[in-house]
Amino acid sequence: MLPWLSNGPAMNFTYPKSFRSRKIAANGTVIHVRIGGMGPAVVLLHGYGETGDMWAPLAARLVQSRTVIAPDLRGMGLSAPVDEGFDKKNQAEDVAGVMDALNVPDGAVIAHDIGNMVAFAFAAQHPGRVTRLVMMDAPVPGVGPLG
């Protein structure tokens, strides 16, 4: 394990004190988002059953030179509970709405697990707003297991 990811025997998912938490009305729902830093924006999209808290160790590093935006995806974490709108194209519009509310025209997008689907939809729908796209723990469509 990388030393900056470890905080003794358990992971530390606490954001630095310089981050602020905000609820943003976007695309017909309310999205909870953590924001910190200054510089080029990076949007961090979490996986299924997780929240933006999963990004705290990475965010603590990125905030030194970037504006970090870590939302809780629609209906998860501290975002408003909802019963609909979970298709990835719609959630991509949630991300666009958050960026609009923060006056962020573009940025790098880093995603994990189900956040990859939202990130891919966002990049497809808003290609001019994505400066870089990083997708982690993502199966590649059309490529099966080796063997």
Residue ranges and their predicted role:
Residues 44-45, 110-111, 134-137:
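Short beta-strand segments
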Residues 15, 24-27, 34-36, 70-112, ...:
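Active-site loop/oxyanion-hole signature of alpha/beta-hydrolase fold enzymes
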Residues 29-81:
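Conserved HGGG/HGGXW glycine-rich cap/lid loop of the alpha/beta-hydrolase fold
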Residues 111, 115, 119:
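Gly/Ala-rich beta-loop-alpha elbow adjacent to hydrolase catalytic centers
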Residues 57, 121-125:
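Active-site signature of alpha/beta-hydrolase-fold catalytic machinery across serine-
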Residues 67, 106, 129-132:
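Residues at the starts of beta-strands that form the adenosine-phosphate
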Residues 128-144:
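A conserved short beta-strand
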Residues 1-41, 64-66, 104-105:
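Alpha/beta-hydrolase fold catalytic core
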